[in-house]
Amino acid sequence: MLYCDAMVKQVLEQGREAADIVLEQLLPPASEHPTAIHQAMRHSVFAGGKRLRPILCMEAGRMIRAASVAGAQSGSHAGSLPAGIEQLGAALEMLHTYSLIHDDLPALDNDDLRRGRPTCHKAFGEAIAILAGDALQTQAYEVLAQIACPAEARVAIIREVAHATGTIDGMIGGQVVDLEAEHKKPDLATLEYIHRSKTAALITASVVSGGMYAGATVADIGRLRTYGQSIGLAFQIVDDVLDLTQTSEQLGKTAGKDKAAEKATYPALFGIEESIHQAETLVEKACAELNEYGEAASTLKDLAHYLVERKK
C-alpha cells in the first residue's frame, strides 16, 4: 500500500463531517416553503458520498497555509484549516450534486440509483429534480459570493469554479461530448476531453480554489492545477474500471451502464490492466508536483493514492 490508510480514513471521515455540518447550515430546511424543492435538494446532498471535492479544497488550503506560515518542512497533518474554508467546500459539493442530479435524468444517463438510494427524479419526479439541480447551482454561487477571503481571491475563485462547470473545457462541455460519443468507437483525444472536462475540471477547481483561499502564489496555483488535473483524470479512469468490476450494491449506483450505453471509457480503449496503470502513472505525476511542499503535502499525496486504490 502506497499511502497511510489509517490517516486517509481519518481525513475522509473528518472532512465529510465538516462538510456535512456546513451543508446542513446552508441548505434551506426541508420544512421551508416550497417544501418539495428543499426536500429534493436535501435528498441528493445528504444521500452520502465521499465529499471528495470539499476535502480536496480544505486540504489544499491547509497545505498552502502550512507552507506559507511555517515553511514547507514544518509538518503537515497538525496544520489548521484556513478559517471559513468549509463554506467554499460546501459550495463545491452543491455544484457536484447538481451535476449528478442532472446526469441521472432520463434525457442524459437515465439512472435509477445514486449513492445507494433512488435518484432525485425517481424520488421526486423529473420536473422537481431539474429544479433541485438548478437550485443547488444558484445557491452554490450565492455561497461563493460570501466566502471569507479577500475580494480579489473571491473573484478569482468564482471565475475558476465557473469555468470548471462551463462549456469550454468544463463540466457541461464534457457532458455534451460524452453524449455525442455514445455508440461510437472511442479515440484517445475525445476520451481525454470528456474525462478532463466532465470530471477532472471540478476536481481541479476544488484544489486550486482551496489554495487561492489560503493565499496561494501563482507558482502554487500552477502546481495545484497540475495535481488536480492528474488526480481528476485518474479518478475518472478508476471509475470506468469500477463500473466493470464492481456490483451495483458495492458502488451504490448502477454498475455496467457505461458498457451498455457504449460510452467512451478507458477500459473500452485500453483494457482494464492498462487503464489501472495509466491511473497510477497520473497519481505519481500528481504527487511529484507537490514535492516542493515537503511534509505539508503528505495528506494530498495520500488522498491521491487512495483515489486509485478505492473500491467505490
PLM feature spans:
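N-terminal amphipathic/basic leader segments beginning at the initiator methionine
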Residues: M1-L27
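Mg2+-dependent prenyl diphosphate-binding active-site environment of isoprenoid biosynthetic enzymes
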Residues: E17, L27-E289, E295-V308
